[in-house]
Amino acid sequence: LDLDSRILIEPCAVLIHAVERAKTTGILRFNSRVAVQGCGPIGLICIAILRTMGIENITAVDGNQARLEFAKRMGATKTVNFMEHKGIEELTKAVEDSFDGHLADFAFQCTGNPKAHANIYKFIRNGGGLCELGFFINGGDAQINPHFDLCAKEINLVGSWVYTLRDYATTFDFLKRAKGIGLPLADLITDKYPLEEINEALKKNLEMTGLKIAIVNK
């Protein structure tokens, strides 16, 4: 693996683990309609992994148009900018329209925003599945209605937390496969800093104007 691929091993392992968790529901399949909410590095890598699995009906949801355009490069077939829609009903309709009048069979929630977690249930069909992996840290409580959002829809919900050693081995295969089909994973690394400029790198990361910020020792 080249240096850029090696830089991406750790975040990609997070998504390999999440997708493997999602597969345990039996709902994530070759022909599934999949919504991915959040187009930061985690969401973008999620889309890339789904594409390497052969899943082609993927809608990306985010409020940043530049990141949505990047999502298309990673394999998303449709995008929905939530900034262009007023209220959850209108946003849900946009997601439904992106799947030609259907709700998602499965969804990945890749943000740490409690409101985003509450919203995503609306995007999923009855009997569908959801993998929540956005809350690596405590982002606060999410307000959902268990009757309407979980029970009545019989949603299959799985959580995902980082990765295992086995996921690392699978990640190597994914990175080779992604490169082989032309997915621009290396473009996720928007900025590289030498070790002596680590403070500048951390500042850039906090500004959230890039995607993956790498510190590369000379």
What does each model-found stretch correspond to?
Residues 118-122, 165-218:
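C-terminal hydrophobic helical "lid"/dimerization subdomain
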Residues 14, 42, 50:
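Hydrophobic/small residue at the entry helix of a nucleotide-binding pocket
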Residues 31, 76, 100-104, 185, ...:
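Local beta-strand N-terminus motif with an aromatic residue
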Residues 1-37:
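NAD(P)H dinucleotide-binding glycine-rich loop of Rossmann-like/cofactor-binding domains
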Residues 114-177, 217-218:
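Glycine-rich phosphate-binding loop and adjacent beta-alpha segment
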Residues 26-28, 99, 111, 123-125:
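A generic alpha-to-beta junction signature in SAM-dependent methyltransferases
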Residues 36-39, 51-119:
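Adenosine-nucleotide cofactor-binding segment
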Residues 7, 35-39, 60, 80, ...:
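Glycine- and other small-residue-rich loops at beta-strand/loop junctions that grip anionic moieties
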